[in-house]
A protein has these predicted regions:
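Compact, glycine/acidic-enriched structural inserts
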Residues: 69-112
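A surface-exposed partner-binding patch
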Residues: 1-70, 135-198
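An amphipathic alpha-helical core segment
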Residues: 95-169
Length: 198
């Protein structure tokens, strides 16, 4: 792990912010979820990915292996871009940026362009460490019709994220163009993977 992550863990520990909207997590506890979501995607060739943070609605964040990725388990997407190999300074800036966005709007989940976290807490109570808010029936089964406050439930986060992956063939890749990114940085997936090999 990069030294900046160790420093963040040393100062903050594994913790939550804003009443459970955002968490700094132990990567080991979420590795099976990350591995399942990465399987058979273009990112798999880049090496191992780790969960460094998550939000209350099943998004997992990883900024560390030459890419910046977000796995959105509810909307069944993986978004990000290939940067190539990070220098140590670039890695520190990227990871610092991830944790700096804790108070930003983009860790929220919205319905009709309105954030719902406060409503979720009011309806279902605060989250435990291993819980998340989800929709039942799942978006993967019925699409946009799932995304209502009436369908919002509190669930075991890891179990639910694994279940959501089982409901789909492949995650959708958003805001990501592999060929253009690779051409821009003048490399290939194999070269990037080799640089990240332990």
């Amino acid at each position: 792990m990069p030294s900046i992550i160790i420093d963040i863990w040393r100062h903050e520990g594994f913790c939550q912010f804003q009443n459970g909207l955002y968490y700094i997590v132990n990567p080991d506890e979420w590795q099976d979820v990350v591995d399942v979501w990465m399987e058979n995607t273009p990112f798999e060739q880049l090496g191992k990915f780790y969960a460094l943070a998550r939000n209350a609605f099943g998004c997992i964040y990883n900024p560390d292996t030459g890419t910046k990725l977000t796995i959105d388990t509810i909307l069944r997407t993986i978004s990000g871009s290939i940067k190539g190999y990070f220098t140590e300074k670039e890695r520190e800036i990227t990871i610092s940026g991830l944790f700096a966005m804790i108070s930003k709007k983009r860790v929220e989940f919205e319905i009709d362009d309105k954030p719902i976290f406060k409503k979720a807490v009011k309806k279902l109570g605060p989250l435990g460490w291993y819980e998340m808010y989800a929709f039942e029936p799942a978006f993967a089964l019925i699409g946009d019709a799932a995304l209502t406050m009436d369908n919002l439930v509190k669930v075991d986060a890891r179990v639910h994220m694994l279940l959501l992956r089982d409901l789909i063939d492949q995650p959708k890749i958003w805001s990501f163009n592999i060929e253009e990114d690779l051409k821009r940085i003048g490399t290939s997936l194999a070269e990037i993977a080799e640089k990240h090999r332990p």
